[in-house]
Amino acid sequence: MLNIIVVLLLLFFSNNVIDSRYISYSKPNYYKTNDKIPVYMNNVRSGLSIFDYYKYPFPKPSTIEYKQSFMSKLAGDLNSTSLYDEVSLHTSVDCIALGKPINYTLDDVNQLKYLIDKHFRINFFIDDLPIGELFKNNRLVEYNNSNSKSSEITSPPSSPSSSSSSSSSPSSSIEEEDDDDTENDHIYLGHPIGFKYNSKYYLYNHLIIIINSTSTKSDKGFYTIKSVNVEPYSCVDCKIDSGIGGVEISPELFDDDKIKQLTIQYTYSIRNHETTTTNSGKSFQSWSIYYVNQFKLSNIDIIMSFIIVLAVSACLAIILLKIFRKTNSKTYTQLSPDDGGWKSIYADVFRSPNNFMTFSIIIGFGVQIVASLFILMVFSVAGLTSIATPGGMAIASILIFSFTGIFNGYSSMRTYIMLGGTRKLYNSVITTTLIPFTILLLMFIGYFQVWSNKFTYGASIGTVFFILAMWLLVCVPCSLLSSYFVRTWPPAEYPVRINPIPRFIPTAKWYQNQYLHMILGGIIPFVIIFTDLSFFLSSWVLGEHYSYSLSFALTFILMIISIVETNMIIEYYQLSLENYNWWWRSLLGPMVTGLYTFIYFIYFGITRIETEGVGFYYFMFSLVFSILVSLFCSSIGFLGNLWFTKKIYSTLHFD
C-alpha cells in the first residue's frame, strides 16, 4: 500500500511538469519568407452535427479535391481544397477577395440563419494546424489594427459595434506580444459563421488570419508555423471601423419585393507574428495551445479522489487487521458457536455460481477492456496519441483492442475451468464472439443516423471492413489461441473444501438488501471518474481538446483501487451475514458504475446538445460506452474479491 501511495504522489506532482500533449512525433513543415502555406477546408460543426464545408453556400473553387488519409477519415476530417491562395509566410496583406461574390436567396439565408442559431463553427487547416479563436485567461483576444496590439473582450463578437471595433487602416504587422505567460492560452477550434443582435442576423464575411511562426538561430532562414488563430468580422468592403454596421442576412429583408437576393463578398486579411527561440525543440510544442488548461480542476479532483481512496483503504485495513490478527494463528478441529459469520460458511463460499458459462464470458471480455485501457494509457502518457496525428487515438484503440483478445480467451477459460466447466470449445467460441458482436452491432445500428445525415465522421465502407477484419483476423484468433493453450491447465485450487450439501442462507433484513449495496458500491468509482467523464464528453461532443495523459493515469489507478477495495468491504459484510452467494454480486455490484455513467451521459446530452439529428446516435454510443464501463468495473471487482476471499479463508487451519 505504501508503494502505491508513493507512485500516486510522484505522478501527481509531475502532472504539471510532464505532459504528453506537448509531444508530437510528426515533423513540422519548414518555410522560407514568402513561401505559400497550404490551406484545406474541413467542416462546419456544432456538437455532433458535423457537415462538409461545401455543403452550405460558402465560397468554393470550381474543382473540389479531397486530401484524405485513412487516419483522417477515422477522425472525420475532409481536407478539401480552398480559395485561400494568398496565404504566405511573413507577407501581410489586406482585403483579399475570397472568390466571387455570392448571391444568397431566401432559402440560402434561412440555411445560414439555422447555422447561426445552432452555433455552428467553420473549421479548416493551415499548414495542417486547425484554426481557431485565441483566448488568453479565458478572454477572447481581438486584433486591434489601430495600435498594432491585441485587445481583450470577454466573449466572441456578438454585435456590429463589438465586431467592428477596429480602425479603418489595418496595420501590416503585429508587434511581438509577451509570450512568457502562455499557461492559460487556448485556441478554441473554428470560428462562428455569424451572430444575432437585436433580433437581426449578421454574417461574418471577413476573416483576419494571424500566423504565428517561430525559428531558431540554427534554422538559417527556415521557419515553422507555431499556431494559427483567426478573427471573424462582419463588414462591407473590409471596413471594420467602429460604428459601421455589419452584413445583415435576416430573412425579413426579403419582405421587400424589390429584394430577390443578397450579394455578399467574402474577404480575408493576413497577419504574421514571428518569434525566435533558442531551443530548437520548442517548435514541437505548438499543439499545447489547442488544449484546454484543466490542471487546476484535475488536481482538485485528484486530491479529492485520493482522500476518498485513503478513507476506503483505512476501512479495509481495519477489516484485514481484524481477520489476520485474530485468525491466522489458530488451528481448528471444529468451529465453535462463537466462530460464526464468515467463518461458518467456509465449506460453501467457493461453491460454483449458477450460469458460470455466462459468468466466465463476462470476466474474459472485461479483462480485455482492462488490458486495452492500460496499454492505451501508457501510449497516451508517452505522447503517442497526440492530436498532432488526427485519428491516432482511434487507430490505436482498434489495434490495441484487437491484440488484447489474448487476455479475453485466457481469462474466460481459466475462470470457466476453475468453476468446473467442461464445454471448453463452446466457451472459447462464445467468449470471442458473443459480446464483441453485440457491441459492434449496437455501434452499427447507431451509425445509421450518422450515415443518413451525411456527417463527415460517418464510417466509410473501408473503415467498416477494416474493423471487421481486425476483429475476425486478429482478435478472434488471439482469443481462440489463448483459450486453446490453457484448456489443459489444472483448475485453480481453493484453500478449503466444498461441502456437497448447500448451507441454508439466513433471511436478510431490508438494509442488508443486495441491491442497496450495489447502488452504494457503484457511487465511489463514479465520483472518482466524474471529472474525466465530463472532459471526455466536452472533447467528443463540443470539440474541445483535453489532455488524457498523467491526470487520466492517476484517475485510472485510483478508480481501480476504489473498485477493488469497495467491493471487498461489501463482500466481507455479506459473508459476515453468512451469505456465500458472492460470485455474481462481486460482478454486478461494480456494474452499477456503468449505470451511473449512462445516466450522466443522457443528462449531458439533454442539456448540452443543441442540434437535431444526433439523438439516436448519441444514445447508442452512450449505451455502448456504459456497457464497456460496466464490464471493465465488474472484472476488476471480481478478481479483487476472488483474491480477497482466498486470502481470508486461507487463514482457517483445520486438523
Swiss-Prot record:
Membrane-traversing stretches: 300-320, 359-379, 387-407, 428-448, 461-481, 518-538, 550-570, 587-607, 619-639
Membrane topology: Multi-pass membrane protein
GO molecular function: transmembrane signaling receptor activity
GO biological process: phagocytosis; protein localization to membrane
Annotated compartments: Membrane
Acidic residues composition bias: residue spans: 174-183
Region (Disordered): 146-185
Entry keyword annotation includes Metal-binding: no
Keywords on record: Membrane, Receptor, Signal, Transmembrane, Transmembrane helix
GO cellular component assignments: membrane; plasma membrane
Intrachain S-S bonds: none
InterPro entries: EMP70
Keyword Hydrolase: no
Annotated signal sequence range: 1-20
Biased segments, Low complexity type: 146-173
Family per record: Belongs to the nonaspanin (TM9SF) (TC 9.A.2) family.
Protein name per its UniProtKB record: Putative phagocytic receptor 1c
Taxonomic source organism: Dictyostelium discoideum (Social amoeba)
Phylogenetic lineage: Eukaryota, Amoebozoa, Evosea, Eumycetozoa, Dictyostelia
Protein encoded by which gene: phg1c
